[in-house]
Amino acid sequence: MPPAGGPRTPRPHALPRSLSRLRECPGRSRIVLALGATQMALGCLIVAVSFAALALTTSARVRHSCPFWAGFSVLLSGLIGVVSWKRPLSLVITFFMLLSAVCVMLNLAGSILSCQNAQLVSSLEGCQLIKFDSVEVCVCCELQHHSSGCSNLGETLKLNPLQENCNAVRLTLKDLLFSVCALNVLSTIVCALATAMCCMQMVSADVLQMFFPHRSHSANAACVTPHGTILHQTLDFDEFIAPLPPPPYYPPEYTCTPTAEAHRGLHLDFASSPFSTLYDVAINSPGILYPAELPPPYEAVVGQTPASQVASVDHQVVDSSSGDPNTAADFSTPVPASSTSLPTSEGATSLGPSHPSPDGTLDTPTPLIPTPVPHHMSPEAASLSAQAQPSPGRVARSVSDPTSCTSSEAVSTSQPAMAACQHQHSSTGDPDTWKTGQGTKPETLQTVSKERPHSLVESKAYADTRVLVAKFLEHAHCSLPTEVRHVVGTIRSMATSEEPRVEEAIFGAGVLDQL
């Protein structure tokens, strides 16, 4: 016998139908339990009353009519019914049904016999106490009207005299026989109900299996076989419905959208420029000021340019308004000459070549002072003279140098545009418009080492701000709104205040690099 908690042997294919139906429905299980218990109680009563009646009489006819055998069969049937409720095996249920059917017939016969004998005892009213060899026996017979004794022709009943009054013993036997008759009738009814229920259960399971093979098991929530028992049924994967998938996850975007920027009143209409091809965005919409994607690494962009780059002189623009004449800022104008050019650098650059020394340091030549441009010359003439002046040499920049310049042509191309803007401001007379300087100031050129520290190269914030300000100055129109001019002026003032610190940091880094 397998253990209570261990696995059990699977059942045959014909068994699960009746078992699962009985196990799945607690109502039918309770009915089977009630019928089994009732049969056990009735069987015990029939056996007890039958033996009591046998003890009161010695007559063979009465003794043979006491249905104690029916009581034993009913008791056994009730016991099988309780077992079928505890262990709902198809074999046990079938045996319970057959035994209940047998009990119906036995109880029916016992009830008939007990009732006949009870009527016989009630008809024998004349009882006498007779002694046979020191043995007392009560003899009951049918009374005759013309005689007071019992005739030998009629029926006689011999009773065991438990007391001197034989009539009391006869009445007790009569009551016991009628009680046995009533108990047999009740047992017949109970056994018939048990037989009908078991038969209907098995037939219904067979019919469901025949007409509905895929729905033979009850779909009621109260009729479910617990997992791990012998009645556990295999899941039907054809009726399995997969759960709904979770909603897709979209990561948050921490960028400024054009819709949000449109509420600020910042409407810029810039012309197309190489800056859009460099950062793969368009610069004619407010959203491009805050690109959703980060710009490409500086090393990747510089890697597309040739190894040796041309050094150029930064163009210095003096911007002053009528309201604040003391405010001045120097900005470079990074207009690339080709698609592979880089933004121009701020500050001073060296025009002489750098020659490495034998010990690994760099030897810087004597800085050259550019020829100042006279004030009476126009910007176009100044640009032509700057182009005609021969360059003493070129500076070999590092690949990772963010201050690399393209050529002097990129600087000279922005001067006619600034002159045109100045001419329009002077003609309109707007006090809030910007004015360009009368000329470029001579600037002392500082020597820069061949290689820059990586800490300066990785400083993307300053480089990006410088490029953004340069693009504002490059594409600035004379008819910009007041708000835009205020924003540009603020950025220029901040960049101007930070220019000396940046130059000192670059110079210090160059000295440390030489050491």
Swiss-Prot record:
The chain crosses the membrane at residues 31-51, 65-85, 89-109, 176-196. Keywords: Membrane, Transmembrane, Transmembrane helix. Residues 312-452 are annotated as: Disordered. It is a multi-pass membrane protein. Its main location: membrane. PANTHER family: PROTEIN ENTREP2, PROTEIN FAM189A. This is Protein ENTREP2. It comes from Mus musculus. The lineage of its organism: Eukaryota, Metazoa, Chordata, Craniata, Vertebrata. The gene is Entrep2.
